[in-house]
């Protein structure tokens, strides 16, 4: 893990363009996931190498969505990069389609040990876990979060990572500064 005092999303060296593996889902309809990450990171001056974790007809807020889990292709997909000498400066992960995908992200960490590890643990919001997320997938995401250089959970995701209860009566949208600080300290203590 990188030293927090020296963390930068990227540092430009001359004409060098930093390369980010963006490990996230791709939605055909709805502004989220790789559809947002690719243009934002590109506008920030990064070369984005997408690694789709799932293909969605739309995000899960729309009724009747379809998901195709891409776990079975991820290893061959990223191993092909090794064959052509692709170098990665950051691994940015978001929505995952299955617990096994954490192993594919760890493979990227092992292949690119100096890459910045950015984890956006996309799995829940407003006290509710997304419909594709099982307890096993939430646990796997919490394990992945512990190895992040930069972690960007919302309040619900932070509670899940910390093993704190959430639900319909959960008021995680209005917390005190002291409670937010407690959660941040607990997340940092996890790794």
Residue map of PLM features:
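Conserved N-terminal subdomain of the carbohydrate kinase-like
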Residues: 2-119, 123-131
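Conserved phosphate/ATP/ADP-binding segment of small-molecule kinases
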Residues: 132-191
């Amino acid at each position: 893990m990188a030293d927090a005092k020296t963390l930068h999303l990227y540092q430009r060296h001359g004409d060098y363009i930093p390369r980010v593996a963006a490990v996230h889902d791709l939605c055909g309809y709805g502004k989220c996931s790789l559809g947002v990450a690719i243009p934002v990171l590109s506008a920030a001056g990064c070369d984005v190498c997408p690694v789709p974790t799932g293909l969605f007809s739309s995000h899960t807020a729309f009724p009747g969505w379809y998901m195709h889990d891409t776990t079975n292709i991820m290893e061959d997909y990223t191993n092909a990069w090794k064959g052509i000498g692709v170098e990665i400066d950051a691994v940015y992960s978001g929505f995952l389609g299955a617990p096994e995908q954490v192993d594919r992200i760890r493979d990227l960490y092992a292949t690119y040990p100096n890459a910045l590890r950015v984890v956006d643990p996309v799995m829940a919001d407003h006290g509710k876990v997304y419909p594709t997320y099982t307890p096993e997938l939430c646990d796997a995401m919490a394990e992945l979060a512990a190895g992040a250089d930069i972690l960007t959970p919302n309040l619900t995701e932070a509670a899940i990572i910390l093993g704190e209860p959430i639900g319909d009566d959960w008021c995680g949208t209005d917390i005190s500064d002291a409670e937010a600080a407690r959660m941040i300290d607990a997340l940092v203590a996890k790794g």
